[in-house]
């Protein structure tokens, strides 16, 4: 992380900056909400069906330097989960009761053929027993 965010003192008991923690999958299960930017971790977290917000304060700069395969607004579950400022992020976190879970479900259906937890069974049936 080149420029980490500053977490206001009053939120330090609720918001953890995990950008230096290397095993991100370990913390997904204990997280109520995920704040990310352009990371592919959104796919894993979406399977937990918990709110995700995309803190894209530098989106134009990122697009100019690296770009995306698809428009960013179409990559995330909904443009409404993209926030550009820290105050907007705090507002979104305050309003998770109104999170668009329908958009999250559409995102999961678009990106995953199976979400039934039976991937190992299918693997055994198709690869080992065939």
What does each model-identified segment do?
Residues 1, 36, 56:
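Short beta-strand/turn micro-motifs composed of small residues
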Residues 116-130:
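C-terminal alpha-helical cap of glycosyltransferases
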Residues 21, 38-39, 120:
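Conserved glycosyltransferase catalytic-site signature
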Residues 29-39:
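Acidic donor-binding loop of glycosyltransferase active sites
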Residues 1-19:
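Catalytic donor nucleotide-activated moiety binding site of glycosyltransferases and closely related
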Residues 6-11, 40-111:
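Catalytic binding pocket for nucleotide-activated donors in carbohydrate/polymer assembly enzymes
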């Amino acid at each position: 992380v080149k420029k980490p965010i500053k977490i206001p003192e009053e939120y330090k008991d609720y918001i953890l900056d995990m950008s230096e923690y290397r095993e991100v999958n370990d913390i997904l299960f204990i997280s109520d909400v995920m704040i990310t930017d352009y990371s592919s971790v959104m796919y894993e977290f979406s399977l937990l069906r918990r709110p995700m917000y995309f803190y894209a304060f530098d989106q134009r700069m990122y697009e100019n330097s690296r770009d995306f395969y698809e428009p960013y607004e179409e990559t995330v579950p909904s443009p409404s989960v993209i926030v550009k400022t820290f105050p907007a992020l705090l507002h979104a976190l305050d309003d998770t009761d109104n999170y668009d879970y329908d958009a999250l479900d559409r995102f999961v259906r678009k990106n995953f053929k199976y979400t039934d937890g039976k991937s190992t069974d299918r693997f055994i049936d198709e690869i080992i027993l065939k």
